[in-house]
């Protein structure tokens, strides 16, 4: 489980980002990918905020699989958009906002099911990793952050094209 909080920086463009020391280096790299995607989708610059990202329980996030979750948490913290609490997500986030495949998807799905989650958002390229109806989960394979956001958020945090 990952959470984030954001406050306007005291000086625009001089915000800071803090992530648990126990988070793996690849998870920390996901924060910088998320910054690019956040700006493209919402128009918000992460550097205008002081952001604290926390892996609850101080867990080590090994690898890039939390990238989409990190993006969702930062987006929620900066925009105020509410994340659905009945959805789990996995997937690496690219600079272009593509949801890239990750390892251990079946195990993550099983863990989500054990935690009472009913909806799981996974990379499209991992679609065949979980046999249909095996875990009783509503599985949504996605290719982009926009597709993931439509499932993760109660209301879209994406800026309108007209803005």
Residue ranges and their predicted role:
Residues 2-163:
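Peripheral, non-AAA+ core regions of ATP-driven protein-machinery
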